[in-house]
Amino acid sequence: MEDGHSKTVEQSLNFFGTDPERGLTLDQIKANQKKYGPNELPTEEGKSIWQLVLEQFDDLLVKILLLAAIISFVLALFEEHEETFTAFVEPLVILLILIANAVVGVWQERNAESAIEALKEYEPEMGKVVRQDKSGIQKVRAKEIVPGDLVEVSVGDKIPADIRITHIYSTTLRIDQSILTGESVSVIKHTDAIPDPRAVNQDKKNILFSGTNVAAGKARGVVIGTGLSTAIGKIRTEMSETEEIKTPLQQKLDEFGEQLSKVISVICVAVWAINIGHFNDPAHGGSWIKGAIYYFKIAVALAVAAIPEGLPAVITTCLALGTRRMAKKNAIVRSLPSVETLGCTSVICSDKTGTLTTNQMSVSRMFIFDKVEGNDSSFLEFEMTGSTYEPIGEVFLNGQRIKAADYDTLQELSTICIMCNDSAIDYNEFKQAFEKVGEATETALIVLAEKLNSFSVNKSGLDRRSAAIACRGEIETKWKKEFTLEFSRDRKSMSSYCTPLKASRLGTGPKLFVKGAPEGVLERCTHARVGTTKVPLTSALKAKILALTGQYGTGRDTLRCLALAVADSPMKPDEMDLGDSTKFYQYEVNLTFVGVVGMLDPPRKEVFDSIVRCRAAGIRVIVITGDNKATAEAICRRIGVFAEDEDTTGKSYSGREFDDLSPTEQKAAVARSRLFSRVEPQHKSKIVEFLQSMNEISAMTGDGVNDAPALKKAEIGIAMGSGTAVAKSAAEMVLADDNFSSIVSAVEEGRAIYNNMKQFIRYLISSNIGEVVSIFLTAALGLPEALIPVQLLWVNLVTDGLPATALGFNPPDLDIMEKPPRKADEGLISGWLFFRYMAIGFYVGAATVGAAAWWFVFSDEGPKLSYWQLTHHLSCLGGGDEFKGVDCKIFSDPHAMTMALSVLVTIEMLNAMNSLSENQSLITMPPWCNLWLIGSMALSFTLHFVILYVDVLSTVFQVTPLSAEEWITVMKFSIPVVLLDETLKFVARKIADGESPIYKMHGIVLMWAVFFGLLYAMML
């Protein structure tokens, strides 16, 4: 049934043909079950374990590695017998990497809560219905309830379907709708039709929503929606239709994978084609097929060299470490890739209640009469400090701190706050914080009374819990509450009938303490309290009270005001009909006005500075709230979203105003607006869609079930720690303290993580370029193998992986939150950086090949071959004068490969130091600014020595121990990489400063001169 809220009770019942007393017939129930289906949310079909496993291999880099492993495995089958073991090492290692990655991926997905499944927890098991097949109320399974059923609910019940209320049996009916709206204050319901067909859920006061809870009262209603037709069902549908989007980093890595696959393909084909002339060399037994397979193996080695196998593991580790740092700042990250996405957040869409504010109502201003002479009067206006439920704060009058005990009227006001109240404050030992027990508004009045301490209670020596209830205890020794006249909509007030336990200034008889909406209470006031006297309250005085109350309710504060009054001579209890709430109005008469208190959900202290930081960082903050426009704008002025006197036209929209715009105007509104008030969940989703269409990266906060679709749709969904399970499981991040400032800290951490990630990704890529160059040069020049696939795997995974991970600990730049957010489509590598890393990579490759060639040609421990012999080594087995006296087995000697591998490892350790900063010199940013990097380099070298000096491992990796002379040569080949990168950084700094790279070049020239001078001295 559409627009059930706008229909009268009779129209709703007639729509389904429901008898208002006896409910549906069995035939109607069967027909409706067939028409509408069961009252349950469909179960989400989970993926099988094999589907999840296959998904882990749906990645281009993984597919390339898998192909390399399969080819290596096939080629290993054709190896000579003595080489069979080492030949199988490479494909096995690759497969182990892939299996480990898949296991981790599947484990993460299986453990991730499903937001859609979490919705099921709000479905009740049973419901109470009235049907014609049985007399009275019967319990049925909730899923058997159909539209048209008469359902009865009472305190503690979970609503089994969307229900149009037809009758309320109690004085009031309060419903906790926090799972849907995120607002903690329970909603008072009624049976009247709401004629507005566009009313938002918060305004549908005659509807009970499925999954919400009855906080107080008892009622009956007709079911108007079941299953997917309920408000919670529509949220489920929207969530299931929301597609997951890849993070900017995932998109960049996908692009990198595509480019890499193309480059690998071209280079592999080129290497294989270049050597076609060598296919029938004597080393291959003159067989073209064996020669083709041999060079195919080299091409596969090239593919292994080009793929940064350690990259996925390093990225995961860096992100995981980032989440630990964020957790210390109360931001719990559920989705690892979202850590990096935080770094490019350009818009934060924040809830108001509980995120920008404390979600703890607090009285900030109040007034009482100072003096009254006829129609002339003056007020005493007090201001209170403190913005939480902790009853600590000061009271000020005209900017001066005062003692409330000096004002007689404040003693009476405190008494009303305590006695006309059904709530309390409680100290949570675990959270070390005070919490409300009951309604937020009433809790604020209790805290006010404790702050006032108008009876001068001595709190010294009391613990926090006892001190927080000391004033209440004092007042309760003076008065006893006999009964309460509950709040009702017609009179908009509540009252407590109290009798004195001891004599006080208020007299010896019983009192009726009243609080409520100022207009309603003043209507029934005949007098006003001025000190200890009671004066007549004229219409002119009432107008002045309402005028000042109006000022409190508008402008910067927009306070929620309550009037406090007392009936000095109330009716006797036996003259009251306490069972009929419609008569309560008659008992709250001849009241004496005491004062008006103004309260608000105050902004968090730290939010203003966080908004300023966001502005400096180029991040726009949009406040999205279900609160009314005036209150929301007032809070936004207090926290700096709007300036004090700023015109909010075109920058602040209510949900209805937004709906009245055309799609083009809506997009323009989202582009400039900073506040959306009185919004529905679908507004949040629409705002996210518009932001995404403008290439903005949005972070969206939420805590209710209704927020889940928007949280899932936004790039960064941020749930509140106090929010629903559905919101938390739909979000990428959960704020443990519900604090907006924690989001800003998380964004800062995200930016730092991205900067560090950029450094280690570039480090790994430049290292891989070096490996590709070394294999390409070896094949192109016809040199013996310098590096084999298993060595390349070791370097990529272990030796490179450790320093790359350590680069994730680089300290953040000091100005990181003074720069605009990076664009989501910003490339990892610019043109200049590509040149830099190609230059470094080419040197790495050349030095690696050069070290192997040095051993063959120049080393005293080597064969001292000629360059021609080295480049034509495959012809050695064919004999001939050119290889006279040369043992052809020398070309398989592990020394050359060990030299190449040692140079590669050493250069890449030094290259890791180069990656401490993109442009800063090692002189200004020395290695010890990141001790993790020094430790990882030491560990990498240790592992390298292990494979050199442990026999079993040296056999697997085909390496051998090196002499002192060989180690010195390794260092000679390696150190220039630091000098080369320092030169390139110097040029980059000069270009960034707009200066000529030639300017102040003498330092760089001197650095190179010293190196070559030392090199020459060592050769003498």
Swiss-Prot record:
Highest taxon in the source lineage: Eukaryota
Active-site residue numbers: D351 (4-aspartylphosphate intermediate)
Location within or outside the cell: Endoplasmic reticulum membrane; Sarcoplasmic reticulum membrane
Keywords: ATP-binding, Calcium, Calcium transport, Endoplasmic reticulum, Ion transport, Magnesium, Membrane, Metal-binding, Nucleotide-binding, Phosphoprotein, Sarcoplasmic reticulum, Translocase, Transmembrane, Transmembrane helix, Transport
Lumenal side: 70-89, 274-295, 778-787, 852-897, 950-964
Entry's Gene Ontology BP terms: adaptive thermogenesis; calcium ion transmembrane transport; calcium ion transport from cytosol to endoplasmic reticulum; flight behavior; follicle cell of egg chamber development; heart contraction; intestinal stem cell homeostasis; intracellular calcium ion homeostasis
GO cellular component: endomembrane system; endoplasmic reticulum; endoplasmic reticulum membrane; membrane; sarcoplasmic reticulum; sarcoplasmic reticulum membrane; synapse
Reaction it catalyzes: Ca(2+)(in) + ATP + H2O = Ca(2+)(out) + ADP + phosphate + H(+)
Binding site for Ca(2+) 2: V304, A305, I307, E309, N796, D800
Pfam families: Cation_ATPase, Cation_ATPase_C, Cation_ATPase_N, E1-E2_ATPase, Hydrolase
Record: residues binding Ca(2+) 1: N768, E771, T799, D800, E908
Modified residues (Phosphoserine): S240
The enzyme's E.C. designation: 7.2.2.10
Cytoplasmic side, ranges: 1-48, 111-253, 314-757, 809-828, 918-930, 986-1020
Gene3D superfamilies: Calcium-transporting ATPase, cytoplasmic domain N, Calcium-transporting ATPase, cytoplasmic transduction domain A, Calcium-transporting ATPase, transmembrane domain, HAD superfamily/HAD-like
Membrane topology reported for the UniProt record: Multi-pass membrane protein
Class of this enzyme: translocase
Binding residue positions for Mg(2+): D703, D707
A single MF term (Gene Ontology): ATP hydrolysis activity
Keyword tRNA-binding set for record: no
UniProt key word Electron transport: no
Subunit structure: Interacts with SclA and SclB.
Function: This magnesium-dependent enzyme catalyzes the hydrolysis of ATP coupled with the transport of calcium.
The protein's name: Calcium-transporting ATPase sarcoplasmic/endoplasmic reticulum type
Species assigned in the record: Drosophila melanogaster (Fruit fly)
Organismal lineage: Eukaryota, Metazoa, Ecdysozoa, Arthropoda, Hexapoda
Gene behind this protein: SERCA
